């Protein structure tokens, strides 16, 4: 079941979260029930009629892949966290980072069109259908960012259960927004009062309504009455120009609607997941646009790729000009 893909998902999710909401209004939180409902929703999200074990749709291959992936990442992160005080060498950091990214790299290689007709098959299905799972990129971004923060020493404490919670948080598991571990744990530790939770619920309701408007009304109309007719005749500059803008608007309203749903359900858990969009089409320039479009991903690349590349070049004095180093870091950021 695709998260936020149909009304059935919303109905099931809201029923499952009803005890969470009731406890929230009482100024309480059950970490045990939160864990149970998260596990239930993850099983539902990864359910599959085609690729499963023992002909059980809820025992899907994607679910098994996800569990193995989470165990892999938790073992890597906890190993690095506990061994860092004794040995914080660059080689160990790189090794852990490579091992963390390895599952995603494997999935991307298997998905690549470079393989063409040479895709590896298993029982008449592509191997990639068994290896990957929905949201592997965004979960990997979380793990990589966490390893970097351990390296920097900005994270002082990591508990296994909190780490699993962070990686497998179901509202944002498929396509973000990408949260930060310290911010997530801070919200998770602080149980809001009844009045504070009431404000979160009101904001969540507003975002869900706005998300329905964006994704199921505006995006639908753009796709039905602009994109699909234009696809029938893409000859000529005007049609190509109209198609480009129509598709850009469709992407925004579809993805922004999804992001609003993800943030709203996060709020119902008492987790204030950061926003993903801030009126991107009002941007004054390309830099301002990327600071408004898919912000959590843009900021992730800025903090984890651009700033670190620039800092490394500055420390090693690889180039004399700060401007040149900034441009190189910018190119590395966009290449990745």
Question: Which functions belong to the PLM regions below?
Answer:
Residues 1-336:
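Membrane-embedded transmembrane alpha-helical bundles that form the catalytic cores
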């Amino acid at each position: 079941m695709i998260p936020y893909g149909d009304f059935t998902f919303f109905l099931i999710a809201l029923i499952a979260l009803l005890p969470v909401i009731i406890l929230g209004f009482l100024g309480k939180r059950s970490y045990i029930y939160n864990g149970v409902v998260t596990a239930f929703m993850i099983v539902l999200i990864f359910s599959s009629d085609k690729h499963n074990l023992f002909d059980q749709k809820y025992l899907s291959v994607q679910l098994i892949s996800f569990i193995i992936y989470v165990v892999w990442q938790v073992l890597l992160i906890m190993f690095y966290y506990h061994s860092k005080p004794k040995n914080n060498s660059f080689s160990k950091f790189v090794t852990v980072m490579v091992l963390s990214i390895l599952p995603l790299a494997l999935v991307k290689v298997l998905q690549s069109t470079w393989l063409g007709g040479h895709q590896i098959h298993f029982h008449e299905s592509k191997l990639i259908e068994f290896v990957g799972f929905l949201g592997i990129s965004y979960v990997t971004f979380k793990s990589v960012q966490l390893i970097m923060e351990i390296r920097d020493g900005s994270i002082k404490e990591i508990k296994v259960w909190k780490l699993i919670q962070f990686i497998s948080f179901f509202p944002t598991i498929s396509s973000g927004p990408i949260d930060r571990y310290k911010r997530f744990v801070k919200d998770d530790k602080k149980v809001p009062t009844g009045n504070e939770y009431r404000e979160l619920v009101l904001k969540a309701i507003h975002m869900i309504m706005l998300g329905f408007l964006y994704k199921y009304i505006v995006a639908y109309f753009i796709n039905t009455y602009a994109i699909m007719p234009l696809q029938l005749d893409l000859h000529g500059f005007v049609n190509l120009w109209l198609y480009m803008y129509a598709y850009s608007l469709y992407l925004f309203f579809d993805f922004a609607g999804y992001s609003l749903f993800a943030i709203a359900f996060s709020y119902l858990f008492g987790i204030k997941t950061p926003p993903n969009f801030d009126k991107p089409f009002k941007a004054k320039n390309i830099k301002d646009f990327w600071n408004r479009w898919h912000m959590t991903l843009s900021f992730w690349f800025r903090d984890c790729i651009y700033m670190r590349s620039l800092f490394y070049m500055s420390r090693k004095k690889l180039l004399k000009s700060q401007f040149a180093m900034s441009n190189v870091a910018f190119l590395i950021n966009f290449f990745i």
